[in-house]
Curated annotation (Swiss-Prot):
Protein name: D-alanine--D-alanine ligase
Organism from which the protein derives: Glaesserella parasuis serovar 5 (strain SH0165)
SUPFAM superfamilies, per database record: Glutathione synthetase ATP-binding domain-like (SSF56059), PreATP-grasp domain (SSF52440)
Physiological role: Cell wall formation.
Pathway the protein takes part in: Cell wall biogenesis; peptidoglycan biosynthesis
HAMAP family: Dala_Dala_lig (MF_00047)
PROSITE patterns tied to this protein: ATP_GRASP, DALA_DALA_LIGASE_1, DALA_DALA_LIGASE_2
Location in the cell: Cytoplasm
Cofactor annotation comment: Binds 2 magnesium or manganese ions per subunit.
The keyword Hydrolase belongs to this UniProt entry's keyword annotation: no
Top-rank EC class of the record's enzyme: ligase
Catalytic activity: 2 D-alanine + ATP = D-alanyl-D-alanine + ADP + phosphate + H(+)
Disulfide topology: none
Domain of life: Bacteria
Amino acid sequence: MSLKNEKIAVLFGGVSAEREISLNSGKSVFEALQSLGYNVEAIDTKEFPIEKLKEKGIQRVFNILHGGIGENGVLQGALEQLGIPYTGCGVMASAITLDKFRTKLLWNAVGLPTAAMEVVRRGQAVNSDEIIAKLGLPLFVKPASEGSSVGVSKVKTAEQLLPAIEEALKYDSIVLVEENLAGAEYSVPVLDGEVLPAVQIIPDGEFYDYHAKYISDNTQYVVPALNADRQAEVAKLVKQAYDVVGCRGWSRIDVMEDGEGNFRLVEVNTCPGMTSHSIFPKSAATVGYSFERLVERVLELSA
């Protein structure tokens, strides 16, 4: 049966810190599906309860909720309970990958390279000198479970470390303090198990923060960014990382080079942005996907 005969909901918005980005992504996805002739409805989950989707006649979901329940397995579990197929990763992969700490533990357990880190939990005494002695300066401080660089700080001096940790703790009870990786930054999309060309990110500012991602027009995206050998190298690493955490459908994996040019894994985005600034469509375009066809392909991979 053609998916065009089904009633499809684009779930977007929601209540996470990434609501605004999700609203933009949802609008783009909704318009793309509409233009292709799908029977589609845009539903902001802040306004409409998920458990009533079945009553509304919804038969399939395109999930474009960033962060929060849209990416942590809660939505996925609810949709499985309702018997509604959905785009993107399943319950387990969603739950694991929204937690950067546990994602890195898994990768490290199978020998995949990541930045060295220290973990700080809410209420724990922090010894700045000890952390800096171990990881050096500058450092990155980030909440374990937020996306879109919400709550992330670059720390250049010892005095900045505690305030940065306090800021990150506003968003999560677990905070990661990571070594600075001095090399280039890449984001690597995966579509149906196929690794697409890496996109190099040259941020407008100190690092790829919320402003550089969504507001600035001066952040540069270079794609394809790597020669064939380096692309093959990063693709092998990214595919291993994707498989270890159990991703399916589509995801985007962020990677950085260290000072020696070795690739290190950073994090997984199981529900990548689909706005005018977004990385996934930029990469997919280089291998022949229009935005509309990319959206349709993600929908076709729903399960």
